[in-house]
Design a protein with these regions (language model features):
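Internal catalytic-core helix/loop-beta-alpha segment
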Residues: 46-105
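Short, surface-exposed acidic-centric catalytic microdomains
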Residues: 2-70
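Generic structural signal for beta-strand residues in well-ordered domains
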Residues: 42-44, 84, 121
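Secondary-structure boundary/capping signal
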Residues: 24-25, 89-90, 110
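C-terminal capping/extension of enzyme domains
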Residues: 6-8, 15, 62-79, 104-159
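Short, mixed-charge, low-aromatic patches
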Residues: 33-38, 103-109
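Extended aliphatic helical segments
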Residues: 28, 39-41, 72-73, 92, ...
């Protein structure tokens, strides 16, 4: 995969456009039916948002992207990764498999959707936020999902 949340049907970049610019199509190239990757990268760099996978190797048990049918073969070395980004204060997950992987790695309880679980690793205090999935398969309107994301972004100081 070339980039995170590249599927035109996924609403991650629409949620971010809606929150930061008041326009769900801010990062959308409607003609080409794709996202404006360069604008997204610039936005992420400007805001100090990093994206990464919780697994470096997975096995798809069925021919779809559902978390239910993904097996984590090799989890990402998250403590090592966090050591490379010392200013990171929060981790955000949008899927159950990522949440499970993080909770298992750091031995923390799962936060409810829209909230966080505090945890300490290597002497650092962090928060694990659990957001609603940006997939349209998750039964919630984009504007309602944006309420959860906005609250989290305000709490971590990005809004």
């Amino acid at each position: 995969m070339e980039f995170y949340y590249p599927n035109y049907i996924n609403d991650m970049w629409r949620i971010m456009g809606y929150i930061f610019h008041g326009d769900r199509n801010w990062f959308v190239d409607e003609r080409a039916k794709c996202f404006k990757k360069e604008m997204i990268v610039e936005f992420l760099l400007d805001k100090g948002i990093a994206l990464y996978d919780t697994a470096s190797a997975i096995r798809r048990l069925q021919d779809n992207a559902s978390d239910k049918f993904l097996e984590v073969v090799t989890p990402t070395d998250l403590p090592r990764l966090l050591g490379q980004i010392p200013r990171c204060t929060a981790i955000v997950t949008t899927g159950q498999k990522a949440t499970d992987t993080l909770c298992d790695t750091f031995h923390i309880s799962q936060p409810a959707i829209g909230s966080f679980s505090p945890f300490v690793t290597e002497g650092r205090e962090l928060r694990l936020y659990r957001m609603p999935s940006s997939s349209r398969a998750y039964p919630m309107k984009l504007e309602k999902k944006a309420v959860f994301y906005r609250k989290m972004l305000e709490e971590i100081g990005l809004l």
